Regions:
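N-terminal beta1-alpha1 ligand-phosphate binding loop
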Residues: 2-22
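Cofactor-binding loop segments of dinucleotide-utilizing enzymes, especially the Rossmann-like FAD-
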Residues: 9, 29, 114
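Anionic-ligand binding patches
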Residues: 2-5, 41-209
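Short glycine-rich, Thr/Ser-proximal phosphate-binding strand/loop in the N-terminal lobe
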Residues: 21-38, 117-123
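Short loop/helix-cap segments at secondary-structure boundaries that form the rim of catalytic
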Residues: 15-19, 36, 62
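Residue-level marker of intrinsically disordered, low-complexity segments enriched
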Residues: 18, 24-29, 200-201, 207
Length: 209
């Protein structure tokens, strides 16, 4: 199976693709991630996923074009979007707002291929237990929240904060595997049939466009 392109710098998304044995090469797109006025969380992540996939596809030489997979994830409480915290106080404020309540995690996933651009949307509900200020501060100092939407990683230390998830665990991580597999199999890709050697699932030579 030839590798697809993964339009993401996220090691979590790469690891999730490896989990379902999809060989891929990482290509990091330069896309403005600002939210448009009046844009819902669902519209936001779908637009960004599509934009990332399209940007990579358009920069590939015609003889190197293979399907491009992209995704975008955001955490939402009501209509407020929580991106990646830039500093300690922002991360702590995010966690305090998420403490003891149920929020939504939206992940848009898109595939650009020779036949066009397809996308899917995963929406999950995550309920956190009550968090103390000291826990929020300590979690920031663990180094884990810095590059995570909503300021937490469900697969990391923050797993101890999560009381319940309704939806897609992999979607909360950043790449919903069910929706991803549906998009790829629709293109004729056979999941799980890649090389036995897992080291061959990630093609060396990450690049940016």
């Amino acid at each position: 199976m030839p590798p697809i392109y993964l339009a993401s710098a996220s090691p979590r998304r790469s690891a999730l693709l490896q989990q379902i044995a999809i060989p891929h090469q990482v290509c990091v797109p330069d896309v403005d991630e600002s939210r448009l006025a009046g844009e819902s969380p669902a519209e936001y992540v779908v637009r960004l996923a599509r934009a990332k996939a399209q940007r990579v596809w358009q920069h590939l030489p015609p003889d190197q074009r293979r399907p491009v997979l992209a995704a975008d994830t955001t955490v939402s409480l009501g209509n407020d979007i929580f991106g990646k915290p830039q500093h300690r106080s922002e991360a702590v404020a995010m966690l305090q707002r998420l403490s003891g309540v149920t929020h939504q995690v939206f992940t848009g996933v898109a595939v650009y291929h020779a036949g066009g651009l397809e996308h899917a949307l995963s929406v999950s509900e995550v309920t956190m237990r009550q968090l103390s200020l000291a826990e929020c501060e300590a979690y920031w100092h663990s180094g884990e929240p810095q590059d995570k939407a909503g300021g937490y990683a469900v697969q990391g230390l923050a797993a101890a904060f999560i009381r319940e998830i309704k939806g897609s665990y992999s979607g909360v991580m950043g790449l919903p595997l069910y929706e991803t597999s549906q998009l790829l199999t629709a293109l004729g890709w056979s999941l799980g049939q890649a090389a036995d050697d897992s080291d061959k699932l990630v093609v060396k030579g990450e690049f940016c466009v």
